[in-house]
A protein has these predicted regions:
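Conserved class I S-adenosyl-L-methionine
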Residues: 1-36
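Class I SAM-dependent methyltransferase SAM/SAH-binding core
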Residues: 40-44, 48-90
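Class I S-adenosylmethionine-dependent transferase superfamily signal
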Residues: 55, 118-119
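A short acidic, Gly/Pro-enriched loop at the edge of an enzyme's catalytic core
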Residues: 89-100
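Conserved Class I S-adenosyl-L-methionine
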Residues: 168-255
Length: 255
């Protein structure tokens, strides 16, 4: 199931997801020692283009693909980027076209072996596939009770749907696709939310979208429930607090 295929999911995704990507691109630029823009970069599973737009800082020609036409309808409002609908494992581009391929918070939905073979086909010699994640662990600054609420209340009510989180990024899996994992980097992103902003973010998660799509809940009902539950963590409607996201980056090089 494509949890991000509906118009409702796309609009909420674009509004609610935090803009952390520029920070990650800074890490990528430093590791690759980029002192000039790359010619071409491709962002796969680009969603509404938040991660794709960030690539404009390091590439002259930027492309984005996603399986969801509704996501791309939102993304296409941004000039200077070429978007098209395509599954991660079958991209509509010629061999050896890109200096960089990125995936932000999407690889766990792929057939990863097929995707790696496709990424190898798309990349120029020695170019990088960079996969990164900005995961929400339920960590709120100076408020340990929020982590308990996230685990014992929120995720029990809305459990995460199945995804591919167990892939082994080992030489045994990567070498047949002519890839090598050259580095894994981990750090935290601090994001400030007020209650409405945190609610808007949480309803973009697949564990919320899944029960909406199956008609067990409505977005309106979940929003009301979240705002009631979250009120205890915010002094008023305008108070903003820091939440920490776990960011990791995998740098895979074509060999």
């Amino acid at each position: 199931m494509n949890y991000f295929g509906s118009q409702a999911a796309a609009v909420r995704y674009d509004k609610g997801r935090p803009h952390f990507h520029a920070n990650t691109i800074g890490h990528i630029k430093a590791y690759l020692h980029l002192d000039h823009k790359l010619d071409s970069a491709l962002d796969i599973a680009c969603g509404t283009g938040l991660s794709t737009k960030a690539l404009l800082a390091i590439a002259s020609n930027v492309f984005g693909t996603d399986l969801s036409e509704e996501m791309l309808k939102v993304a296409r409002a941004e000039d200077g980027i070429t978007y098209c609908v395509a599954p991660a494992e079958r991209q509509p581009f010629p061999d050896n076209k890109f200096d960089l391929v990125t995936v932000s918070s999407g690889v766990h939905w792929f057939n990863i072996d097929e995707f790696l073979a496709e990424a190898n086909r798309l990349l120029k010699k020695d170019a990088f596939l960079i996969i990164y994640e900005n995961a929400f662990p339920g960590k709120m600054e100076d408020q340990t009770d929020f982590a308990r609420w996230n685990k014992e209340v929120y995720l029990r009510r809305f459990p995460s749907p199945p995804r591919n989180n167990t892939y082994q990024w080992t030489p045994a899996n990567l070498e047949p696709k002519k890839m090598v994992l050259s580095r894994t980097e981990s750090f935290q992103n601090a994001v400030k939310f007020n209650r409405d902003e945190l609610t808007a973010y949480l309803i973009t998660q697949s564990n919320v979208i899944a029960p909406v799509e199956s008609a067990k809940f409505t977005y309106a009902a979940i929003e009301r429930w979240l705002k009631t539950e979250l009120a205890v963590f915010f002094e008023n409607d305008h108070a903003r607090h820091v939440f920490y996201f776990n960011n990791w980056i995998k740098y895979l090089q074509k060999i």
